[in-house]
């Protein structure tokens, strides 16, 4: 430390004391220089700009002055804890403050902070600091919402051609979807005693209630026929070779039937309505032959209920499932892929038009395609067991074909 001439002779101090002071200064200097090498430096600072208090490398504009992190923290703690009345100086307040000596005299360092213009009134107490942080977070959230709304406003709506395609697909769905929007009024609940007493043993440990299975097979043929009719009403589908049409229908039939059942999930009665007419509970569908597939369809129904899909969205999702170019054995793979892309683009633009409140609605909805694919795969495995355990005469021919 530098000080005014004094009657005290520094050489009169014990040698050990002088050695310890020097060692402490060197160690302090090394730590401070090391800490100043890292950290974010704002773009408004000149290269190697110095702290106006101690001369160390400045990190920004703090309490109305350009200072380093060390002097910023020292000033803040001093004011927040009201420490300055307790500070004292051994050398009559005449210490020179630099990055090596700054930690050795708190009073002179604080006086230097004040003399260069650091503002005490800008230091916030704990409650004000918490309030400021909260305000910053609220502003960030507000800006994020504004940006999201702005991005939604700039997302394209369907073009005139896409609206025409959307209309065709929607009408195809409505004309082939049993009971339409009146399914709740027209549904009939499967009697509770059916599907509660499994009889035929299955190889995987589950059992099949043959009475429930028989009830389900009565509605399966009309349900499959309606899926076929839906596909035939789509102009792009009818332009494909018959071989490809058959492959696409076999591939998507279970997926579309599962989707049509899932969107008719009723949380109040905890039922799915099959083919627009038969309301069944989870255990009934499970014991009626579907086993774990029943859980997957019910779970899908629960999750889709939050999406509040309209007829058009269900119809377009069905068209996307139908036009899947990765089905094995297809001839016109490229043409089918382009058809699906056309449906997907129109679908995405329609989602933009609808302006759902669910964050990331579009990608979340597309994930349901994967869920439906998994349901189909599980059903295919389950179907092999059913063919072994259930009487052949109970299977409708069309069901066996798809």
From Swiss-Prot:
SUPFAM superfamilies: Glucocorticoid receptor-like (DNA-binding domain), Nuclear receptor ligand-binding domain. Residues 51-125 bind DNA. It is found in: Nucleus. A zinc finger (NR C4-type) spans 51-71, 89-113. SMART domains: HOLI, ZnF_C4. 3,3',5-triiodo-L-thyronine binds at residues 226, 275. Gene3D superfamilies: Erythroid Transcription Factor GATA-1, subunit A, Retinoid X Receptor. Residues 1-22 are annotated as: Disordered. Residues 1-50 are annotated as: Modulating. Keywords: DNA-binding, Metal-binding, Nucleus, Phosphoprotein, Receptor, Transcription, Transcription regulation, Zinc, Zinc-finger. It holds the Pfam family Hormone_recep. Probably interacts with SFPQ. PANTHER family: NUCLEAR HORMONE RECEPTOR, THYROID HORMONE RECEPTOR ALPHA. Nuclear hormone receptor that can act as a repressor or activator of transcription. High affinity receptor for thyroid hormones, including triiodothyronine and thyroxine. This is Thyroid hormone receptor alpha. It comes from Aptenodytes patagonicus. The gene is THRA.
């Amino acid at each position: 430390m530098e000080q005014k001439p004094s009657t005290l002779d520094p050489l009169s101090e014990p040698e050990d004391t002088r050695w310890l002071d020097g060692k402490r200064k060197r160690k302090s200097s090394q730590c401070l220089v090391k800490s100043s090498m890292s950290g974010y430096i704002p773009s408004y600072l000149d290269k190697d700009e110095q702290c106006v208090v101690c001369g160390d490398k400045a990190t920004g504009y703090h309490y109305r002055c350009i200072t380093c992190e060390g002097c910023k923290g020292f000033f803040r703690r001093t004011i927040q804890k009201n420490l300055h009345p307790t500070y004292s100086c051994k050398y009559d307040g005449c210490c020179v403050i630099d990055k090596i000596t700054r930690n050795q005299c708190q009073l002179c360092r604080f006086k230097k902070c004040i003399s260069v213009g650091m503002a005490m009134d800008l230091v916030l107490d704990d409650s004000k600091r918490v309030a400021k942080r909260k305000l910053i977070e609220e502003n960030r959230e507000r800006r994020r919402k504004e940006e999201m709304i702005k991005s939604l406003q700039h997302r394209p709506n369907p073009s005139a051609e896409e609206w025409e395609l959307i209309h065709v697909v929607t009408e195809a769905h409505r004309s082939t979807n049993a009971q339409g929007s009146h399914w709740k009024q027209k549904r009939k609940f499967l009697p509770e005693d059916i599907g509660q007493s499994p009889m035929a043993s299955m190889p995987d440990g589950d059992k099949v209630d043959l009475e429930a299975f028989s009830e389900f097979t009565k509605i399966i043929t009309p349900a499959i026929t309606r899926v076929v009719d839906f596909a035939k009403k789509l102009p792009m589908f009818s332009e494909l070779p018959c071989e490809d049409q058959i492959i696409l229908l076999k591939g998507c039939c279970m997926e579309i039937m599962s989707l049509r059942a899932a969107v008719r999930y009723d949380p109040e009665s905890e039922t799915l309505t099959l083919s627009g007419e038969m309301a069944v509970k989870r255990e009934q569908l499970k014991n009626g032959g579907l086993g774990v597939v029943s859980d997957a369809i019910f779970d899908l129904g629960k999750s889709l209920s939050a999406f509040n899909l309209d007829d058009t969205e269900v119809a377009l999702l069905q068209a996307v499932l139908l036009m899947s170019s990765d089905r094995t054995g297809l001839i016109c793979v490229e043409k089918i892929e382009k058809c699906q892309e056309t449906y997907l683009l129109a679908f995405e633009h329609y989602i933009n038009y609808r302006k759902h409140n669910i964050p990331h609605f579009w990608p979340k909805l597309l994930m349901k395609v994967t869920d439906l694919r998994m349901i189909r795969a599980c059903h295919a495995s389950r179907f092999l067991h059913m063919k072994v355990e259930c009487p052949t005469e109970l299977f409708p021919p069309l069901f066996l074909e798809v």
